[in-house]
């Protein structure tokens, strides 16, 4: 799917070291980028890369300076170029507080995707490489790394303007450098964490278990319901969609004359109507898994108390019928010892 680029610009942050002090200086463009096929292709790649990264949700704090200027932009009180220049200086001031600060290219882009307006902000690194020119000579070149970036945020402008109480209009990349982002990029935005997808997924799993318990389902019936929930969530995940609570409820059996969505509301699980799915958490609906002290185990939940027995008194698992490939490895190891 394509995106429609409305406005975009690049500015640079340059690191200057003077003794023990670090200062980030901003090099600002004085005009927006022309929307050429190359610019559109670059933004499409950035959009696709961002879509595939692990993200957390955020909201603006009440006194966010960035949010105040963003609001002025949306109210058409200032132009996009002026907004981008001010934002770059704001980021330079924040980034200069940290020893790990490095030079980079800041991109700000306002674009539309699937009838939704977004503001994308990312700090991109430059990479060095070699190219062969028309004379077959080798030359050094520098390029923007638009696939491997980890300092970025995106604001859903449509959601921000339509739903003031939303807790998911801002997303940012989380991961190995999550601390960096929380330390300076979120401070630059004047934002704090909003919706927590991990907590929402865990609450959903607990709600499903409790729903089966209050419905007095036996083990097989409970496993069937959990598998049904997992298949729905897996489908949503594969299609890049959220878990829609009412849609999920409609697919489940009504227990004790109470649909699943009504049960969750009455029990105050605090579930959102739309929940971003997390694959690793949802797997526990149908599997038991764990690792530690050199052992990693994972098996289907339906095998417990059939092929797999757990004795809590001795803290042991007994497995009847090992996987053929594991059995083969064990037999080879036994022969080599003898």
Curated annotation (Swiss-Prot):
Q: Where is coiled-coil annotated?
A: none
An example molecular function term from Gene Ontology annotations: single-stranded RNA binding
Annotated Gene Ontology cellular components are: bacterial nucleoid; cytoplasm
Q: Which InterPro entries match?
A: Nucleoid_associated_NdpA
Is Cytoplasm tagged as a keyword?
A: yes
| Keywords, ordered alphabetically | Cytoplasm
User: Which protein are we looking at?
Assistant: Nucleoid-associated protein HI_0839
Specify the species: Haemophilus influenzae (strain ATCC 51907 / DSM 11121 / KW20 / Rd)
